[in-house]
A protein has these predicted regions:
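N-terminal hydrophobic targeting signals that begin at the initiator methionine
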Residues: 1-2, 17
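Short glycine/proline-enriched turn or capping motifs at secondary-structure junctions
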Residues: 3, 126-136, 141
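Sec-dependent N-terminal signal peptides
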Residues: 3-13
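Short glycine/proline- and aromatic-enriched beta-strand/turn motifs that initiate or cap beta-hairpins
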Residues: 15-60, 142
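Outer-envelope beta-barrel architecture signal
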Residues: 17-23, 35, 47-51, 75-81, ...
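Residues that define the transmembrane beta-barrel architecture of outer-membrane proteins
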Residues: 19-21, 31-37, 58-64, 77, ...
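Residues on the lipid-exposed face of transmembrane beta-strands in outer-membrane beta-barrel proteins
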Residues: 27, 37-43, 66-70, 83-87, ...
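Sequence/structural signature of outer-membrane beta-barrel proteins
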Residues: 28-32, 44-48, 56-62, 73-75, ...
Length: 143
């Protein structure tokens, strides 16, 4: 009975609209911040907006995130911005990290994009505040 309940509760996640699941590979990420591999799920999508939750990982760190992605121009080459809040846990530090990103997204196919841009991040770890500007580049796969 427990297995049936588990299957029935997970099944709607896979029966939803396409393009809600995103997997990102590359150096950092616009949605998940300090990550080489990231996963985001779009809670709500419109033609030019995406509201997401997700997580990413580096070799020894983890990032959980939630935010909003807005497309200014959506075509084969799209310009967009992302505002997100992230919780970062790493061997050397942990804390909250508000993040703003601007980027270009080039559609290689219907489900594959190349992303390049920059992000401004502020790390709040309780005892200090650090800010920085970082580039990101990567591949995004939508499912």
């Amino acid at each position: 009975m427990k297995h049936l309940f588990l299957i029935l509760s997970i099944l709607p996640l896979f029966a939803q609209d396409i393009n809600k699941h995103n997997i990102s590979l590359g150096m950092f990420d616009d949605k998940t911040g300090f990550s080489f591999i990231g996963y985001t799920y779009d809670i709500r999508q419109t033609k030019i907006d995406e509201y997401f939750i997700g997580g990413g990982t580096m070799i020894v760190g983890f990032t959980g995130s939630a935010g909003w992605k807005h497309y200014y121009k959506k075509s084969k080459l799209s310009f967009y911005s992302v505002l997100s809040g992230q919780a970062v846990i790493h061997m050397g530090f942990s804390g909250l990290m508000p993040n703003a990103s601007f980027g270009l997204e080039y559609n290689l196919s219907k489900r594959t994009q190349v992303k390049i841009g920059g992000m401004v991040a502020i790390l709040l770890d309780g005892s200090s505040v650090e800010a920085g500007v970082l580039p990101f580049v990567g591949l995004n796969f939508r499912r």
